[in-house]
Amino acid sequence: MVTYSANYSPSFQRRSPVAVHNRRSNMARMDLNNIVGDPFALITISTSMIAWLLSFVTCVISDIQGLFPNFAWWAVGYMLCAIIGISIVLGSQTSHVYGVAIVGYLAAGLAFTSLAVNSLIYDDEASKQAAAAGFILQSMVIIVWIFYFGSSRHSSSRGYHDSMGAGKEQHHSYRNSKPISNNYGARPETTVSANQPPQMYTSAQLNGFETSSPVSGFPPTATNGADIQNRFGTTLGSQTNLGGGSTIGQDHQSTNEVSQPTEYPYRAKAIYSYEANPDDANEISFAKHEILDVSDVSGRWWQAKKASGETGIAPSNYLILI
């Protein structure tokens, strides 16, 4: 089996231009099922659209009837773009990628809607007061969105919101939406990726290995060979060429292999789908909301076990402990 170190695993190597082209062609796409099947997304988007329509229609009526603050139109247009953008993000399940940007845009939108409310709510016209009510409702939805997108994926509130869509099964590949990072962190050492440390001997153990020949790796004399056999047993003493060291390396490698864990004390739930890299036998694929058994949660990659018995490593930022 080919041995990979943590820094030279195929998962971290630069992909060929063909792979990059295929990756770009498989970018995250909008899927309305992700909104319809998620009560949180469906309720917040529907409420924001109703509030926006209320403010838009009443602003048109107020503008026709008389003087109208032009700043309110900027708030109407800005919130339309914000609602469309958030709908696309929730529909493509890329909130973990654009969450920081969304919070910034929503913070500005909250300021705009608040100023629009202040300029409309104190007027005696019913249409302007209705427009202010629409902006107030939009502000309430914005506050909920800021709390959602601004929270960590591992927070209890975010996990509760994500679990609301548990009845919706996701089959799209995680590669369509996961961020590309070259500084993700080292993976845990497994049987394939473990670095084998060099075998060390003391000076007393190396006594008898000396050779009078200046050529490195020259076969020892019969006396030295017998002494080696007495010190290390028949396995080492039976070798005729110490320079090659093939048997020594194989024996040492077999004793230093990291075995698979036998206990999985933790349970984790997948908050996003993940498709394992076909070039790396250590990774495992899993679907969204799938339950995995985890042996260690200290690193960025967790050793996990599926219900089918398949074991491997999984990225920790796509799992949440339960």
Swiss-Prot record:
The chain crosses the membrane at residues 41-61, 71-91, 97-117, 130-150. Keywords: Cell membrane, Membrane, SH3 domain, Stress response, Transmembrane, Transmembrane helix. One of its GO terms (cellular component) is plasma membrane. Residues 159-184 are annotated as: Disordered. The keyword Isomerase does not apply. The keyword Transmembrane applies. Gene3D superfamilies: SH3 Domains. Residues 1-40, 92-96, 151-322 are cytoplasmic. Residues 62-70, 118-129 are extracellular. It holds the Pfam family SH3_1. It is found in: Cell membrane. It is a multi-pass membrane protein. Its main location: membrane. InterPro entries: SH3-like_dom_sf, SH3_domain, Sho1_SH3. It comes from the Eukaryota. Forms homooligomers. Plasma membrane osmosensor that activates the high osmolarity glycerol (HOG) MAPK signaling pathway in response to high osmolarity. This is High osmolarity signaling protein SHO1. The lineage of its organism: Eukaryota, Fungi, Dikarya, Ascomycota, Pezizomycotina. The gene is SHO1.
